């Protein structure tokens, strides 16, 4: 059996989301701070969840900077740490379940396990999207996320973008894998419809079972009683007339008997006065009326 499309799509999107979330969690690039007083114009400070890095003209990058404003103690940073780590752990668990559920090395996948992995991956995407959105909401609030006063400016950095992308990919991949529940639910519904009832109802009226003799059915009815249009066997078929081969031969016309003697001679009006055969002998070879 070929791997369903929803499973293949989920198995592609989920690892990509895991990689992006892992990079966004570890990289010090959630917020970009620049425009410091009494420092070169090109000095920039990248703040992350675990570290700060100072960069100047893209040539020198120094990490492990001292937190002078209490940035790491801010509530959005602490919550983001916990939720991002939880999201990564849930993603790993979901991928493990998906690998066991899809089972590309076997013919039939495990739809229940694949659907469960989709639910876990979807939850992992939510756990990654919540801290990223919350951090972005308070990005410019210096009371919540401490930062130097103006003219210092704060901007969104690349780690937030990676977090958004990774979380969205996990949501899509988890939803795609969760669609694997559809064949399993369909099969269960079919089993319930085809399953036997709880038990036969007991009738209050006593019934009498009468066995009627089965009538002898004709051979044609026996073969057509199942509702299928099947031809009867050869012994019950009527023999078809054989086609005539050739052409009819001409037959001679029947010959009729002809007599050259006029049998009506002497029966006309002219012969009424003539003497009959009884008075004088008949010259004709035919018998006379008196002889009849």
Swiss-Prot record:
Family the entry assigns: Belongs to the claudin family.
Biased composition (Polar residues): 273-282
UniProt cross-references to PANTHER family, sorted A to Z: CLAUDIN (PTHR12002)
Subcellular compartments: Cell junction, Tight junction; Cell membrane
Major subcellular site: other
Residues that span the membrane, as ranges: 4-24, 82-102, 111-131, 161-181
Tissue specificity comment: Expressed in germinal center B-cells, placenta, stomach as well as in colon tumor.
A single BP term in Gene Ontology: calcium-independent cell-cell adhesion via plasma membrane cell-adhesion molecules
Membrane topology (UniProt): Multi-pass membrane protein
Region (Disordered): 222-292
Species assigned in the record: Homo sapiens (Human)
Domain of life: Eukaryota
Name of the protein described by the UniProt record: Claudin-23
């Amino acid at each position: 059996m070929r791997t369903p499309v929803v499973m293949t799509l989920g198995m592609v999107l989920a690892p990509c989301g895991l990689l992006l979330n892992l990079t966004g969690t570890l990289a010090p690039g959630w917020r970009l701070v620049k425009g410091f007083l009494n420092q070169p114009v090109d000095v920039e400070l990248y703040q992350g969840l675990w570290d700060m890095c100072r960069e100047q003209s893209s040539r020198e990058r120094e990490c492990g900077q001292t937190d002078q404003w209490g940035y790491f103690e801010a509530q959005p940073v602490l919550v983001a740490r916990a939720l991002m780590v939880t999201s990564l752990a849930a993603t790993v668990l979901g991928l493990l379940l998906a690998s066991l559920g899809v089972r590309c090395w076997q013919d039939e996948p495990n739809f229940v396990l694949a659907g469960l992995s989709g639910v876990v991956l979807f939850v992992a995407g939510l756990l990654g999207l919540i801290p990223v959105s919350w951090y972005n909401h308070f990005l410019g609030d210096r009371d919540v996320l401490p930062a130097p006063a103006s003219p210092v400016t704060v901007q969104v950095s690349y780690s937030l973008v990676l977090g958004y992308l990774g979380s969205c990919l996990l949501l899509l991949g988890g939803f795609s894998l969760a669609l694997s529940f559809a064949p399993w639910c369909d099969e269960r519904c079919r089993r319930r419809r085809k399953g036997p009832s709880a038990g036969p109802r007991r009738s209050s009226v006593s019934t009498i079972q009468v066995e009627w003799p089965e009538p002898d059915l004709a051979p044609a009815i026996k073969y057509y009683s199942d509702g299928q249009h099947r031809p009867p066997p050869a012994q019950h078929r009527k023999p078809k007339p054989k086609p005539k081969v050739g052409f009819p031969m001409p037959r001679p016309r029947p010959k009729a008997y002809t007599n050259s003697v006029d049998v009506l001679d002497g029966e006309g009006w002219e012969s009424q006065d003539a003497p009959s055969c009884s008075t004088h002998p008949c010259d004709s070879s035919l018998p006379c009326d008196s002889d009849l």
